[in-house]
């Protein structure tokens, strides 16, 4: 059961609505049932560092219908957590939802209750974030705060206090480890993709620091009170492009200097339209105290971790997961070789590449 997340007064304000006509039409081709969107508002939200906000809004998408046992507990909830600065809706694409959410597929939405939240602070989402108005006065949240916000949304908003499955990608993968350690009774199984169960350090942290400093050290940042996006955000997005790269694929798709240059220019131009500097900095800094290594033995969930050799963020050659995952009972680790189907860090969007391992995990649960 979900315990109360610290001592706070939370009031659920649910505003459920069907997705837009365009979204519903697109989702109809990808899922067994259409998605619905809603918002949950928690009052007097306290952050781990002592800061607080009078209220936070958590936006979410749900697909399917909750099923309850005789005690009223939801038995078919699947929570899917997105990566840094994304939103829950990023999974509603053919390569993910089209492979998993349809009739007869592994996460058939007519069987499971799928929950896709926009995480606290995430720039592309509709949940509360710095760019809503507080800018650099926004509380300096971390992953524990983000998990707390989602747990409140689940328990007090959607009346879900138990997860059949947590699917976590990138940041969501890291949060999965933290969640299963701090609240081991919450989650039956976790399908985790593109992360490592150890402190963000080495090259991973160095790149995060470079991106954060690209923005914060730009005079145009003005301590977060800029009137236009600081130029340093462009450099930060450039760093992000490199670490998110899929070298084998990109060599094939952009085989000339002109093609590569055009891709970079298009990528920067498009991402500058949707990225806010404060949102960006806050999200990447939220990993600053992530370190699940010491408590892996507390995890009770069945765990499947899948990484790829072409993931710049989480290099497979370091052997971290092979050494650490055995500490978590009922855990498995798979390191995928580089193929024409892998996409570097973002291989998690290509469900066809790893869905057989999800199937194995569900088999352990008896489906």
Residue ranges of model-derived segments:
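Alpha/beta-hydrolase-fold enzymes
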Residues: 186-270
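Conserved alpha/beta-hydrolase "acid-adjacent" motif
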Residues: 312-318
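N-terminal cap/lid subdomain of alpha/beta-hydrolase-fold enzymes
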Residues: 61-131
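Active-site nucleophile elbow and catalytic-triad environment of alpha/beta-hydrolase enzymes
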Residues: 279-295
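Cap/lid segment of the alpha/beta-hydrolase catalytic domain
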Residues: 101, 105-157, 203-204, 208-222, ...
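Catalytic active-site module of serine/aspartate enzymes centered on a nucleophile-bearing elbow/loop
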Residues: 331-367
């Amino acid at each position: 059961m979900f315990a109360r997340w610290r001592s706070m007064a939370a009031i659920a304000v649910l505003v459920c609505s069907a997705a837009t006509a365009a979204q519903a039409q697109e989702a109809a081709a990808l899922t067994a049932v259409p998605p619905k969107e809603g918002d949950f508002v928690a009052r007097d939200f306290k952050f781990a560092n002592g800061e607080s906000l009078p209220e936070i809004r958590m936006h979410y998408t749900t697909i399917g219908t909750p099923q309850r046992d005789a005690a009223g507990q939801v038995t078919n909830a699947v929570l899917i957590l997105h990566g840094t600065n994304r939103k829950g809706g990023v999974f509603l694409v053919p390569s993910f939802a089209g492979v998993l959410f349809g009739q007869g597929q592994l996460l058939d939405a007519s069987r499971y209750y799928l929950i896709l939240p926009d995480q606290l602070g995430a720039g592309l989402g509709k949940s509360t974030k710095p760019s809503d108005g507080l800018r650099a006065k926004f509380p300096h949240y971390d992953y524990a705060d983000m998990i707390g916000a989602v747990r409140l949304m689940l328990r007090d908003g959607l009346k879900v206090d138990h997860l059949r499955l947590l699917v976590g990608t990138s940041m969501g993968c890291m949060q999965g480890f933290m969640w299963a350690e701090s609240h081991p009774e919450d989650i039956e199984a976790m399908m985790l993709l593109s992360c490592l169960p150890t402190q963000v350090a080495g090259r991973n942290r160095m790149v995060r620091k470079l991106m954060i400093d690209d923005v914060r050290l730009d005079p145009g940042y003005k301590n977060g009170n800029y009137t236009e996006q600081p130029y340093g955000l462009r450099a930060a997005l450039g760093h992000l492009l490199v670490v998110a790269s899929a070298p084998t694929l990109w060599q094939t798709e952009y085989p000339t200097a002109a093609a590569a240059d055009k891709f970079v220019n298009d990528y920067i131009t498009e991402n500058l339209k949707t990225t806010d500097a404060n949102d960006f900095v806050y999200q990447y800094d939220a990993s600053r105290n992530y370190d699940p290594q010491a408590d892996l033995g507390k995890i009770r969930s069945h765990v499947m971790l899948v990484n790829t050799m072409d993931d710049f963020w989480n290099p497979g050659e370091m052997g971290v997961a092979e050494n650490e995952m055995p500490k978590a009972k009922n855990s498995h680790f798979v390191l995928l070789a580089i193929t024409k189907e892998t996409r570097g860090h973002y291989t998690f969007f290509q469900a066809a590449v790893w869905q057989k391992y999800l199937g194995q995990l569900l088999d352990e649960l008896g489906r």
